[in-house]
Amino acid sequence: MNWLAEKTIKHKGAIIVVFTLMVVFSVFAAPNVSINYQMADYLPEDSKSTVSLNLMNKEFDKSPPNVRIMLEDVSIAEALSYKEKISKIDGVKEINWLDDSVNIQQPLDMIDTDTLNSWYKDNNALFTALVDKGDTLKQTIEDIKEIVGDKGIVAGDAVTENYAKTSTSEEIQKIMLFIIPVIVLILMISTSSWFEPFLFLFTVGISILINSGTNIFLGEISFITNATAAILQLAVSMDYAIFLLHRFSEFREEGLEVKEAIVNAMKKSYTSILSSGLTTILGFLALTLMRFKIGPDLGIVLAKGIVFSLLAVMLLLPVLTIYTYKIIDKTAHRSFMPSFEKFSKIALKIGPIVVIIVAIVVYPSYLAQGKNNFTYGASSMASSEKTQIGKDTKKIDDTFGKSNQIVLIVPADDPVDEKEIGEEINNIEGVTSIISYSNNVGNEIPKDYVPKEQLSDLVSGDYSRMIITISADEESDIAFNAVKEMSELGKKYFGDNYYIAGGSPSAYDIRETVTSDNVITTLGAIIAIGVVIMLTYRSLSIPIILLIAIESSIWINL
């Protein structure tokens, strides 16, 4: 790599121009990268919930409601007025209330209690609405909130997605505002110049910006990738810059001229930087082995980010160092890092004890990490009372009960089995209602006698749709057990010709896919990183020792 070090210094101007052009491109490209907030879109194409969702969108014109709106302390007349106003908002496709189920001109005492309490309870009204989740979603939600004002509370899948969109960018900014000063402080303590930390951050920041801009060539990235890529790239890449400038400082102390010192620093540090970078890249690329496509999405972006970080450190940082070495010299300070000589002696003495302790706790830690509870979708934000949307969701749930809809699609030519499966589903824990042709209309009534608009919600040309409501959070044990039991019943009555969709089925499939992916990605990462370490150190024992130490620390941490 000696030639690269010399060529880099020789073509300083060209390197500055190339990086400047990439930065200019990225400044305009990064804001235009499409962000996907639907976790279910990253399931394998052959997963049951994905196939089911595609079929439902093809066979049925309308999806189930995705917004719940509660109005507090309103009369029937006031509720109808609010419903009328909300229905006129752009993006609101449909809104339902009590008047769509019963004749509200009759006295409330005459209305079935369960039906009444589902829509109007203790002077509180609950609407369900279907809104377009496209580019107008944010404005639609804002318009609804503006109309209902202080009297209203808005929740549901569409609101959760909108919250994810708005909160993600805000949270990234908060994290960056917190972590950058911390990094600067740590770097100031660990370096020998007040200016070096800002040079590090500038170099890595350039690589982060370029990585963000080049994401436009991927078409779209997930909101998880968008939220974590920059922070992870910053955390992982900073070491490369520190390696190089520490070497530079050492050669300057030996009396070498600036250019000679930076060339020697590049030659001496390239091996450690490249081997470290390569192990990181391969670790991230191991995520591409996942069937759950969040893995490849995140892995490719992060691996690409490390490549740009390596290029920035190996090409841009040496050039910037040559241009700014006078500032580095003027802002030089003594090292604030303590001597680790005593620590190293203590570590060597207690090393055998530490090995014994780790050997004792590592297996229980491995078993314990398998018992961790994970969340698999954006709905976890709605179930957390730490967020405003979580508080709003709880308030609606406390008044009208939880409402989690699951769609089961079955062949339309078998009404007897449809009715029987509906009766069995009704006995599943958590199920509060089933809307289907056989259940709400009746198989004895010919389809020709049912209004076309109502019929199309439940029956298409080949399939019948059952909309099942369960009183449980999307990712709760009750919901997952319900999905499992419904799938078993679907297979019992219709073989493989049944389809199940909704938030809970998608989260269930994500959980099953991620669980199976975990073994593959872990093995892939271990093999790839082990090979790199083996080639770097030309040893068989060192990779084994390092990987055992790394995996043990991961299990203990989890």
List PLM regions with ranges.
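Structured non-transmembrane domains adjacent to transmembrane bundles in polytopic membrane proteins
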Residues: 45-158, 373-542, 548-558
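Surface-exposed, low-hydrophobicity interaction/linker segments
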Residues: 35-37, 103-104
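Membrane-embedded transmembrane helical bundles of large multi-pass transporters/channels
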Residues: 1-35, 132-374, 491-558
